[in-house]
Structure formats: C-alpha cells, structure tokens
A protein has these predicted regions:
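An amphipathic, basic-hydrophobic alpha-helix
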Residues: 65-97
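C-terminal alpha-helical cap of glycosyltransferases
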Residues: 354-372
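Active-site-proximal region of nucleotide-activated glycan assembly enzymes
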Residues: 35, 56, 114-178
Length: 372
C-alpha cells in the first residue's frame, strides 16, 4: 500500500468540522506520511477554522436541502457540481478513504467516494442523524456513532456501525487551565462562568445574559464571566457589560476551548452534539439551552444525556424573552451559589464522557485503508 489520502468532508457549522479535525489529528499521529485533505463549504466559519490547520483543502459550492422549489433546484445542481469536483480530487490519489460528518458538504463527497469505489466512513454525533448523514448512509462502509440510540435511525444501511462517542481534539485529553487563565487575563481566585453559543454564537442566549447582568453583579466578588458572543453580537454584548462591576472577558470567538473548559466552573450554552461531548470530557457542569427550532429537537435529546447522569440541567429557550430570562435565572442563581452541587455535577460528567473516540475512529480508518 502506497501513501494513503484521507478525505474529510463537512462544514457549515463547527459541529460538522471539529469532529473531523479531531480524527484527522489522530490519523496524522498514527500515520505521519498520510495526506489529510478537507472538503468544506463557503461559509465564513469554515474558513476561520481551517485557515489555522495547515491541512490541504478544497471549497465546494454545495448548499443545503430545502423544500422551496428554487432552493431545491440549487441543492441538486450544487450537489452534482460538488460531487464532480470531489471525484476529480480523489481520483488523483492511488489510495484513499472518504470520511463524512454531516452537513451539506458531506453528501456529495461520500457519493463521489462510492462512485470511485474507495472506502467511505460516516461520523454521526447527534442522536437523530441530519439529512446529510441519513442520505450518505447508503454509500457508507462504516458509521461511527456517539450514541447507541442512533442505530435505529439507519435501518437500511449495509454499513457496520460502531458506538464510540464524539471525537474531540487531542487538546481535550491534556488541557491547560493556567494557559487559558493567563491568555484571557482571568483572576485565578474567582470562579469562571462561561457563556457560549458554540462556534456561531447565540443571539437569544446573549440577550438573556445581558438582561441578567444586574442580578449577576451580586456574584461579582466570587465569579468572573467569559462570554463568547459570535461575530454578529460582539459589539452589542460588549456594550451591555460596560458600567457593570463584573469581571469579564467578552470575545467573538476563542480557539483554545479545551484549555478554557478546564478553567471553567459552570457553562451556559447550546447542546449540540459536540458541545455536550466537550462538557462531559472537560468535566464542566452545564446549563443547556437546546436550540428550539430543529424539527427533531435533537439538542434536547443530546442534553438529556447529561441530565440523565446529573451532569447538567436543561432550560427551555422559550419564545417569550421575559420567561426565558426567568427560567435561566431560576437554575443559574442556585448553581452559582452551591459549590458542592457543582462538584457533584462535575464528577457526574465522567459517566457520559468518552474521551478516546477520535483515537478509536482513526484506528478503524487506517484499517479501512488497508482494504483499498
């Protein structure tokens, strides 16, 4: 077997990118001479993440699947275009493996891999698979799951399925809390409340926290806040903190999340599959506000995995802003004041954590390559 090329496909949100990067790191560590190449979308979040990796990459014109006739036609056309681009790139290599992780970029690349006869793997981190993974399962040889319950959502696949957890980048296995504290200028004598809407930010979480700032000032002597806003809300959130006596660090984005989680005592955030896995592996008690607009409510199911073991609580992101703020404060205030309960929740995270997922998937991909 000559040099193997591993083609990773996913993008549009961090939840489709970070698991692939985690596995790519492990493949590279085990097989240093392997080529790592990514297919990703045109969205800004993809560019922001991939520009720092040093991996080869190709941008695809693929778009999401919608019921609107014009958007549906666009999906079909860009799917075909993306499949052709991927086929040309993959066909240049002597030996290849394709790995998809959902998102509208993954489908055409998995299809390209199947048409070329190379091994195809899927990484599915949500309990309920998205449309891309549901579609791509027909072309997959192996599917790697975060949750055992996901098996029932792939009834027609011929692929072998493995429940391994959600792959996280290697830094999560060896985080450095002191690095994050120094990097962000935090007070090592104060607890850290992390507010995050994942890679793209959350306007509704941002607004809720900003409305709670007067109440949060009661905890200013013992707590500090790291607030990751996303690009769109940064200026407004920064302004909201002005004039408060809260110690805070407001950023639109932060790349060292493993180190930051290690320094965090409580997190408020969404419950995407990657976020839930990060909370668990990092051992951080969480207040989860599942994204309310997914039809399958998969973020509620993800967060449920933390509440089942006592590692997190769920707050409904209801439509009424006043009600949302009141519900959040009802959970947040007692948790900030109860060190013992937070310690119990942090310990409970171990029951949900699967820190070796990336390593296990990488080992299987290398075995798949040997059959090519």
């Amino acid at each position: 077997m000559g040099r193997v090329s591993y083609f990773f496909a996913g993008g549009g949100t961090g939840g489709h990118i970070y698991p692939l990067l985690a596995v790519a790191e492990q493949v590279q560590a085990r097989q240093p001479d392997a080529e790592i190449h990514f297919f990703h979308s045109t969205r800004a979040v993809d560019e922001r993440v991939f520009e720092k990796t040093g991996f080869g990459r190709t941008t695809l014109p693929a778009t999401g699947l919608y019921a609107h006739p014009i958007k549906l036609l666009r999906f079909v056309l860009t799917f075909q275009q993306s499949c052709k681009i991927a086929m040309r790139e993959i066909a240049k290599r002597e030996s290849a493996v394709v790995v998809g992780a959902g998102g509208f970029v993954a489908g055409p690349v998995c299809r390209a891999g199947r048409k070329l006869g190379v091994p195809v793997a899927l990484i599915n981190v949500d309990i309920v698979p998205g449309r891309s993974n549901w579609l791509s399962a027909r072309w997959a040889d192996e599917i790697f799951l975060q949750f055992e319950e996901s098996r029932s959502h792939f009834p027609r696949t011929r692929a072998a399925m493995h429940t391994v957890g959600c792959p996280l980048r290697s830094r999560f296995l060896h985080p450095d809390a002191k690095k994050a504290i120094a990097d962000l200028g935090l007070d090592s004598n104060k607890h850290v409340l992390l507010v995050t809407g994942a890679s793209s930010g959350s306007t509704r979480i941002n607004e809720a926290i900003c409305r709670l700032l007067p109440k949060l000032e009661a905890f200013a002597d013992r707590w500090q806040i790291v607030h990751l806003t996303g690009l769109d809300n940064y200026k407004a959130v920064l302004e909201a903190y002005r004039g408060t006596r809260l110690s805070r660090k407001v950023l639109d984005y932060y790349d060292g999340m493993a180190d930051l989680f290690a320094a965090t005592d409580l997190v408020i955030g969404r419950s995407g599959a990657v976020s839930v896995a990060e909370y668990a592996v990092a051992g951080v008690p969480s207040i989860c506000l599942p994204y309310p607009f997914h039809k399958d409510k998969h973020q509620y199911l993800n967060a449920g995995k933390l509440t089942e073991v006592g590692a997190g609580v769920i707050v409904d992101d209801v439509a009424d802003a006043d009600d949302r703020v009141a519900r959040l404060w009802k959970e947040l205030e007692p948790l900030m004041g109860d060190d013992a309960r937070r310690r119990q929740m942090a310990e409970a995270c171990k029951k949900a954590a699967k820190p070796q997922a990336a390593s296990e998937i990488a080992a299987r991909l290398i075995e798949m390559a040997k059959k090519n």
